[in-house]
From Swiss-Prot:
Function according to Swiss-Prot or TrEMBL: Acts as a chaperone.
Biased composition (Acidic residues): 596-611
GO molecular function per UniProt: ATP binding; ATP-dependent protein folding chaperone; unfolded protein binding
Entry's family note: Belongs to the heat shock protein 70 family.
Induction behaviour: By stress conditions e.g. heat shock.
Protein name: Chaperone protein DnaK
Entry-annotated residues carrying Phosphothreonine: 172
SUPFAM superfamilies in alphabetical order: Actin-like ATPase domain (SSF53067), Heat shock protein 70kD (HSP70), C-terminal subdomain (SSF100934), Heat shock protein 70kD (HSP70), peptide-binding domain (SSF100920)
Annotated organism of origin: Shouchella clausii (strain KSM-K16)
Keywords: ATP-binding, Chaperone, Nucleotide-binding, Phosphoprotein, Stress response
Gene3D superfamilies according to UniProt: 1.20.1270.10, 3.30.420.40, Actin, Chain A, domain 4 (3.90.640.10), Substrate Binding Domain Of DNAk, Chain A, domain 1 (2.60.34.10)
Amino acid sequence: MSKIIGIDLGTTNSCVAVMEGGEATVIPNPEGNRTTPSVVAFKDGERLVGEVAKRQAITNPNTVISIKRHMGTDYKVDIEGKSYSPQEISAIILQKLKADAEAYLGEKVTKAVITVPAYFNDSQRQATKDAGKIAGLEVDRIVNEPTAAALAYGLEKEDDQTILVYDLGGGTFDVSILELGDGFFEVKATSGDNKLGGDDFDEVIMDHLVAEFKKENGIDLSQDKMAMQRLKDAAEKAKKDLSGVTQTQISLPFITADATGPKHLELTLTRAKFDELSADLVERTLGPTRRALSDAGLSASDIDKVVLVGGSTRIPAVQEAIKKLTGKDPHKGVNPDEVVALGAAVQAGVLTGDVKDVVLLDVTPLSLGIETMGGVFTKLIERNTTIPTSKSQVFSTAADNQPSVDIHVLQGEREMAADNKTLGRFQLTDIPPAPRGVPQIEVTFDIDANGIVNVKAKDLGTNKEQSITITSSSGLSEEEIDKMVQEAEANAEADKKRREQVELRNEADQLVFSTEKTLKDLGDNVDQAEKDKAEAAKDKLKKALEADNTDDIKAAKDELQEIVTALTTKLYEQAAQAAQAQQDGGNESADKQDDNVVDADYEEVNDDDKK
């Protein structure tokens, strides 16, 4: 069975892992890093992904970051005359992770387990599956990030324990409470905030820098796109620095200019000031944490371990806040950047049978239901219900002789339908005429192991049935997804072709250089006619490079390579002959020296005879 990879598709960074020899292993990217920035850039028709895209973000306005924050919405990115959905941008990131995994494993990868924030709604989960499909991946399972982290943390743990997974990533926050032991993982409750993460901590530092610079220079940097990108990079670096030191220097020379000349930003940021700036953000993580404890029917003292996930949990104020709330020192035995991908790989191992005796019971993060008379939200499945699950309820008509009913499917916790998230609508028609309240309409909700919702409505009188699989609210049809899959494949092919062209040019340039050196080294050791032939072939290759015709470059390169190889062979042969001649000459002269040697007679003198 081919490998199923585990992917943590993050807001800021992504990570891919696989089961090898019974253990989950992170797959490094070609740059040697274990995580890849979730950044995509477009430049002169070329797509850049990861570290290379992040490095040029300051100078390239066509750079997309933190796209995960827009998953499941109708948000679009307009670049070079084309609109991209969040699914398409995410698919470009997934394509890179897929290619890196294939290079590492030496085999084609077609299946994946992808993680999502536990608090993602159905639209966001469906959008993630669509992104996988566009990238050429069959998404076998969607796993909640805190659950994946718990899988990686608890796989070898045999003792029963209750853990709290506190997951503060680049753009989302989740908290889950699980009971685990001896291969059994049960999520008791989950909560979170999909609009809170490390990006927001960067933002408060940026706002502070903008305010301080304006106070000092009277210039508002927030209107300058390039300056703001430099500020974002500096803010992110300062945030990371302050996890290890108590103050850091932010220095951005030539950040802008006015009539008096260039302006530089120089500022010292202390950890205390950063804590003050981000205090509200830290506090916002504690509300969902308390709610999860309450939903699980537990107090802080019932928690055995606190597992921190996500790069933002390295912030000292965050660690201090969770320690204060739970009374526990956070567990430091997992890498917060990698543990989710490792857990996804474990889940992939469960699906392939590589990992045995693991039972995972997850929950739905939000309540599900329909709109009933008066715009009320009637819940059929309460939040934190173990999935997969199915629930039915019978409803009736609101008016006499009503021929159809609209089923408005919603997800959320508010009392009124208008305040919750619409997942979809469908209609059950051809209801026989009857007084209101008489027809029996059974509505059934099914949630699968991915947290994806199916809803059906059935008229119990006629057995007529209508169903809907909720698709993402971004409204991507199957046709649109298939078209995007084809575009993604075409782009991957184009990227491969472009790389091959670049490599061909580099090889041709190198050959021109080495030819010039070889001709110089040959000097008068070969016929002028042969040298002229090589010169002509070299000039032909140079012209082909200038014309930038791939076929001509390849043909001219092959022709020159053949001539240079023959010349080089001749040079080596001459060098070998010269060396042999020198060795023979050395042996001859040694023989002559032997002929001139005279054997001397000697006589032993006895000192006693001299006396």
